[in-house]
Amino acid sequence: MGQLRTRKRGSTWEWSFEGAKINGKRNPISHGGYRTKAEAITAGTQAKAEYDSAGRRFTPSDISVSDYLDYWYDNYVKTNLSYNTQKDYEKKIRVHLKPAFGKYRLASLETDIIQKWIDGMKRQGYSRSMVKNTLSCLSGALGYAVYPWKYIKYNPCDYARIPKIVMSDEAKAHTEYICVKEDFAAIIERFGPDSNFYIPLMTGYHCGTRLGEAYGIDLLHDVDFERHTITIQHQLTNEGGKWYYRPPKYDSVRTIKILPEYEKILKTEIHNRKKNMLRYGQYFTKTYQMDDGLIFQAPSNVKIVGKEIMPISAKENGELLTPYSFKYCAKVIHEELGNPLFHSHCLRHTHGTLLAENGAQPKTVMERLGHKDIKTTMDRYVFNTEKMQNDAIVILADAIS
């Protein structure tokens, strides 16, 4: 490329240099309006360096890990990952990765530094899942530095190992809690059909949905009563104070069979919702899904250009209910019902375990729960219950005899 040049034009200074030829013709690049020659040289030097680096504002061999993480976040995370994942990664970068690695050059970061950090997180008492997820964030960033960006030759995270981290008995009990029939019956007795939490609870129990997926069901478009199916194609998620329909985690859109008992619950809800529309008239709040996934609500007498939907959970007057409200339900179960192990995800664990202990094939359970692989299903969502152990003994006895 040509050398940087400066010249005075009137009362101001301009920098210029020759860019790559286009169709065999010269491609001069310039910018003016600087008060002094020194200002023009400084700005021109920066512009030429950025041009020579194909628009990058840094030299890959010199960039710090801190600046690279910012670059990766702006150019990959914001473009390709969901809002909630963006927020999660932003926090992991700010709280964990920059303090640990930000001062190093990207090109000099090696596995031993990463391994010391992992071991340090264990000593500080972080859970295995926290260590694993934070390392995954770093590995994802460095993986893109290898390919497609080719800033470094290999990913040093590939050779790091997470040591054995023993889960406390309390944490293990919470994670592996299965909501047995007696516990669920007590919950439904407290939050019966007239409660706003009845349908989300029954949806988690009958369909094994994530909490956001349960609240993301549209009764107008996602339920097929003729085929006895429900399609899980959205999760209701909060982005900057607004609610959106977004694809499920891992894009795990799926259509699953539902029981007559659950169908009856949904039919009753649709019937009651229509009755309330007539009862409230113009004061009923209708719900719409906009083109960008935004969930928008307006009085029924206001015409909105958007897809009208019927959220599975709403107040009597149609106002949207969200996963945030479920915190109250969990609090009541903990304190009033004396069940501190309950959490919204346990209904998903319960669903998978009930299927497995009654003979459902692992692949069927995996697809019903919307997992990306069977290992996740069997390791984290299907627990070895006493019934399974007893069944195994019966099978063994039959085989031996």
Model-inferred region functions:
Residues G32, F58-S61, Y73-Y147, E319-S325, ...:
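N-terminal core-binding DNA-recognition domain of tyrosine site-specific recombinases/integrases
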Residues G32, G216-V223, M366-K372, R380-V382:
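A short, basic/aromatic helix-end/turn motif that makes direct DNA contacts
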Residues G32-D62, T79:
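N-terminal helical hairpins
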Residues Q124, E189-D194, C207, I256, ...:
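Short, basic (Lys/Arg/His-rich) helix/loop patches that form interaction surfaces
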